[in-house]
């Protein structure tokens, strides 16, 4: 049965019935109008509820939920800034490695033989990559002036031009389907990262990129795929459940670990400092939110700040 539409007064009453403290209905109406009930309440209520009664813990206010929402909003902005930096590096490294091997003709990246065709699935995936994600840029008019310029003036769109218009998801797929020598050339750009490890990172980072781009809840997001085990998992003594590391595989800390390997050291230190500042601010501003709860949901071990104390290899 579909959930019924609720007016703002009904939404406020529903929250009060669940033990949320609201003393100013007019201010609460403005808040719900600005953020939207589903995005704000459904997205961020869990940390404030009693797991047994499903009601809000005593003293929880609408401002507490808004504070967590704003933390996540700022976390998305910070994360996306550095995701774009990694993305830019991967674009450059991929186009250079591919064109060094196969040349500047657009026919090179449209040729299935220039990808890894090993296995039952790869040939089909390569064909899908070419026909759905690469060829349309050449056979249809696009919104990218630089692509149209190369088509009309030069009759050729080299990969180093096209690659800027590709989504991070397509870029990740191109890496996954690349020949081993191309993957090796790209992974060498990053200290201590092997080909398979980079592929798993790109797959996970793509999911986080989509969460940021679509304003979804980020801090507690988990991907279905894992990043590969890394030396830092062991060096930081991340606890294990059997052979599986508990933290840093498909949670936000997996993204932090990936950034540690894929960002220049100076940039990672800046990112880490800004991240720590955000978490500390969220802890100070939210009386109902224990910092340990937030870190747990983000997949952070207690010693996460020591990530830069260890060598990456």
Task: Name the predicted role of every residue range.
Residues 1-313:
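Long, contiguous internal "core" modules enriched in hydrophobic/ aromatic residues
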């Amino acid at each position: 049965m579909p959930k019924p539409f609720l007016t703002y007064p009904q939404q406020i009453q529903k929250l009060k019935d669940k033990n949320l403290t609201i003393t100013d209905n007019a201010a609460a109406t403005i808040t719900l109008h600005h953020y939207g009930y589903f995005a704000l309440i459904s997205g961020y209520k869990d940390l404030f509820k009693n797991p047994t009664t499903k009601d809000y813990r005593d003293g929880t206010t609408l401002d507490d939920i808004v504070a967590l929402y704003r933390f996540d909003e700022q976390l998305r902005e910070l994360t996306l800034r550095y995701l774009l930096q990694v993305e830019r590096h991967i674009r450059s490294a991929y186009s250079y490695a591919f064109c060094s091997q196969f040349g500047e003709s657009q026919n090179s990246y449209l040729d299935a033989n220039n990808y890894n065709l090993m296995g039952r699935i790869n040939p089909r995936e390569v064909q899908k990559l070419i026909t759905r994600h690469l060829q349309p840029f050449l056979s249809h008019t696009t919104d990218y002036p630089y692509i149209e310029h190369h088509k009309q003036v030069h009759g050729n769109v080299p990969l180093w031009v096209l690659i800027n218009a590709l989504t991070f998801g397509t870029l990740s797929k191109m890496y996954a389907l690349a020949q081993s020598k191309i993957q090796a050339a790209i992974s060498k750009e990053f200290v201590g990262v092997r080909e398979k490890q980079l592929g798993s990172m790109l797959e996970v980072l793509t999911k986080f990129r989509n969460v940021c781009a679509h304003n979804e809840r980020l801090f507690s997001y988990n991907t279905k795929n894992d990043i590969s085990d890394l030396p830092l998992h062991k060096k930081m003594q991340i606890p294990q459940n059997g052979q599986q590391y508990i933290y840093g595989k498909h949670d936000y800390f997996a993204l932090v670990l990936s950034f540690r390997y894929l960002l220049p050291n100076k940039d990672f230190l800046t990112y880490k400092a800004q991240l720590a500042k955000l978490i500390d601010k969220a802890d100070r501003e939210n009386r109902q939110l224990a910092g340990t709860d937030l870190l747990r949901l983000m997949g952070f071990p207690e010693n996460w700040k020591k990530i830069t104390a260890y060598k990456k290899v």
